[in-house]
Amino acid sequence: MEPFAKALEIVARVMRDGAATHPDNDWVQRGPEYHLGRAEEHLRLRRDGDQLQDHVSHAATRLLMALTLRELG
């Protein structure tokens, strides 16, 4: 876990911040494909030079959401 410790802290922060604007863990009501699409959008925005958010952190969070939902079945 050591190499990923800082990255996981950042993902946890994104989740905490998201909980303030998206109550009730509403992300679990979406399917994995939705979160994959949102991750792709964050990566596209980063490639296009957008700096309004930390798009890599948000993309990583969305990928972990998709993985979690896939594993929960």
Predicted regions and their residues:
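Intrinsically disordered, low-complexity regulatory regions
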Residues: 1-73
